[in-house]
Swiss-Prot record:
The keyword Membrane applies. Pfam families: Opacity. SUPFAM superfamilies: OMPA-like (SSF56925). This is Opacity protein opA60. It comes from Neisseria gonorrhoeae. The keyword Signal applies. One of its GO terms (cellular component) is cell outer membrane. GO terms for molecular function: porin activity. Gene3D superfamilies: 2.40.160.20. The lineage of its organism: Bacteria, Pseudomonadati, Pseudomonadota, Betaproteobacteria, Neisseriales. Its main location: membrane. The gene is opaH.
């Protein structure tokens, strides 16, 4: 330990591995609310993804307690899903005409935690001159953008058999119906989280830090966003 008891301002740089859980509360297709998307599949309602991102912090060490402000940007998640379902409506036995309903769904979604600006209060446990486990609490102002584009196309396919020997069948696409839904939001909210980890003093001023943090970004309109992060970084005290 240094002569000043470890007190002073510091900067820290981390590389974090984040598990991101995004839950969208879209209404069911039969819901009466027509102002929100109702055709998206469960694939876009409940998203789990992982990313790696940098994080920087500045803080002050009071010799036991620390306060720190941090900033991070996350990777943009985007994906698409296409599905098709063919359902037989009826077959006319008297003439062999078959009618099927073909439903195509095309969904495109994006989610981006644009930024997180946090303030943490952290307590270091003095185990020995080198190791310092710590716990803390964090409040953060987060900015999130997300969008979904859902297209549902339904057509009836009529198949007419040929009366001629070895003749080809004839198909007709009738009664096409298309439903397009789009939603885009840019939201800013204050969320809460917890921090834990351990610091190892390489020198009196340089510390290797391994940490974990959980953060609930708050209620983002129809979206809930939570992150679990494991990080490794270095902290330099002036």
């Amino acid at each position: 330990a240094s002569e000043d008891g470890g007190r002073g301002p510091y900067v820290q740089a981390d590389l974090a591995y984040a598990y991101e859980h995004i839950t969208h509360d879209y209404p069911e297709p039969t819901a009466p609310n027509k102002n929100k998307i109702s055709t998206v599949s469960d694939y876009f309602r409940n998203i789990r993804t992982r990313s790696v991102h940098p994080r920087v912090s500045v803080g002050y060490d009071f010799g036991g307690w620390r306060i720190a402000a941090d900033y991070a940007r996350y990777r943009k998640w985007n994906n698409n899903k296409y599905s098709v379902n063919i359902e037989n409506v009826r077959i006319r036995k008297e003439n062999g005409i078959r009618i099927d309903r073909k439903t195509e769904n095309q969904e495109n979604g994006t989610f981006h935690a644009v930024s997180s600006l946090g303030l943490s209060a952290i307590y270091d446990f003095q185990i020995n001159d080198k190791f310092k486990p710590y716990i803390g609490a964090r409040v953060a102002y987060g900015h999130v953008r997300h969008s979904i584009d859902s297209t549902k196309k339904t057509i009836e396919v009529t198949t007419v058999p040929s009366n001629a020997p070895n003749g080809a069948v004839t198909t007709y696409n009738t009664d096409p119906k298309t439903q397009n839904d789009y939603q885009s939001n840019s939201i800013r909210r204050v969320g809460l989280g917890v921090i834990a980890g351990v610091g190892f003093d390489i020198t009196p001023k340089l510390t290797l830090d391994a940490g974990y943090r959980y953060h609930n970004w708050g209620r983002l309109e129809n979206t809930r966003f939570k992150t679990h992060e494991a990080s490794l970084g270095v902290r330099y005290r002036f």
